[in-house]
């Protein structure tokens, strides 16, 4: 196995919270998948959840080498959690096509947050 993609992103939680307050659910719908929205609407700390998802999706798009462009959208990525709470990445659409072209067989996602920031790192392995 070899690393074929690496991406990292950091999001300021307060900035995401302000965007959410300004644009409401429309901002969240632009970033989150349908499955993620189902979780989002039930949370008290929506801004923190959204900041972590935003950072993860930006990191994943950087690992693809495209960023959120060239047909890759936030909706192409869904962040889920396994039975132990470990986050993992599910790809769809153009992101899945590009990952296949890169020979990606394994994805790794690390998420962390503290008072002011959320950070994510994504590694794609062939």
UniProtKB/Swiss-Prot annotation:
Pfam family, one: ACPS
Keywords: Cytoplasm, Fatty acid biosynthesis, Fatty acid metabolism, Lipid biosynthesis, Lipid metabolism, Magnesium, Metal-binding, Transferase
Cofactor requirement: Mg(2+)
Any one GO cellular component localisation term in the record: cytosol
A GO molecular-function descriptor: magnesium ion binding
Cited Gene3D superfamilies: 4'-phosphopantetheinyl transferase domain (3.90.470.20)
Protein name in the entry: Holo-[acyl-carrier-protein] synthase
The organism of origin for this protein: Vibrio vulnificus (strain YJ016)
Lineage: Bacteria, Pseudomonadati, Pseudomonadota, Gammaproteobacteria, Vibrionales
